[in-house]
Amino acid sequence: MKYGAVLLSSLLTTSVLATSGEIDCAQAATNYEVNHCASIELEQAQEELQRYLKTSLDLNQDDRELSQAISNAQQSWEQYYEAHCQAILTKWREGTIRTTMALTCKTQLTKQRTHELWASFLTYVDNTSPELPEPQM
């Protein structure tokens, strides 16, 4: 019981620190800080991916076949994403860097996928401006 109270207190303290913005990601040094910052970067990349995916689907909603193809490709990509980054986690399974490496893998693949969506479905072959700005890799 005492251990549970200490654990709960520790988790609450960690949660408060994480949400209060006290971690300076530019100065992250501990595994916790680095992983916390990597998680934030991944979350931001995933939000951007969802925005580009939604825009790709919305823009092509009148073409059911294309919309379905985009959705199918996304599902296949998600399976690859999970399998590949799990392999990265396995590669580093003996080290404390494993979580950071897996998060970095997910962030990189997410940014690549966002760029693929942009290049494939949100740009034009002529000089028409793209539907969204080019995402940063």
Predicted regions and their residues:
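N-terminal alpha-helical modules
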Residues: A18-M137
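Sec-dependent signal peptide recognition
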Residues: M1-S9
